[in-house]
Regions:
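Contiguous beta-strand segments within globular domains
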Residues: 51-65
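Short beta-strand elements
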Residues: 137-172
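Short coil-to-beta strand junction motifs in C2/discoidin
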Residues: 72-78
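Hydrophobic/tyrosine-rich beta-strand signature of extracellular beta-sandwich/beta-rich modules
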Residues: 80, 129-133
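Solvent-exposed serine/threonine-rich low-complexity stretches and specific carbohydrate-binding patches
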Residues: 90-107
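Proline/serine/threonine-rich low-complexity linkers at boundaries of modular beta-sandwich domains
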Residues: 34-42
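Aromatic sugar-binding surface patches on proteins
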Residues: 105-116
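Bacterial N-terminal signal peptides
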Residues: 6-17
């Protein structure tokens, strides 16, 4: 009986502590956490698949985003862009097939990665992607930032070949 009472008291203490920790997430803490995540070197987007034998005429885009130190839902919106010879810059491909929204779940710690593979026809040309990283809490956006794909992220999961990371992809 005494053991059951001690267990109940400990469980109640843990519940109260968890509730007060959640209550400590005020606007100032949220702003600091979002600013830190936005400036983090762990926040990136990369091309991890580019027209390989296994992924013929495919573009793979992967992103990584840090958590905020408290529970927040995390999303990435991936928009594939093409090189415009006329405008000498990358422009968004105007098709629902070139945009996807990825949910990375609700997390409080660590780094989260996800990605998407986009099929194209041969001779599409030079592509990259713009990724919008979004943190929400209670259904409201608390942070959002944008990155273009860059090279050098050899820890990108599911790369083909392994450790492949590039800023752009040419579909030939």
């Amino acid at each position: 009986m005494r053991a059951a009472l001690v267990t109940t008291v400990l469980a109640a203490a843990v519940f109260v502590a968890a509730g007060s920790a959640a209550a400590d997430v005020g606007p100032a803490r949220i702003a600091r956490a979002v600013r830190s995540a936005e400036q983090s070197r762990s926040l990136w987007a990369t091309v991890n698949i580019c027209d390989t034998r296994k992924y013929r005429n495919d573009l793979g885009v992967r992103g990584q985003m840090p958590t905020l130190g408290f529970a927040a839902s995390m999303f990435m919106v991936v928009q594939v862009d093409f090189w415009s010879q006329a405008q000498h810059r990358f422009l968004p491909i105007q098709s629902n097939l070139a945009t996807t929204r990825l949910s990375l779940g609700t997390n409080a710690s660590g780094l989260q990665q996800d990605g998407a593979v986009f099929p194209f026809s041969a001779h599409t040309g030079l592509l990259n992607a713009t990724v919008t990283f979004i943190w929400t809490r209670g259904g409201k956006v608390i942070g959002q930032t944008v990155r273009r794909t860059t090279a050098g992220h050899t820890d990108a999961a599911h790369s083909s070949p392994p450790r492949y990371s590039a800023a752009q992809c040419r579909i030939t």
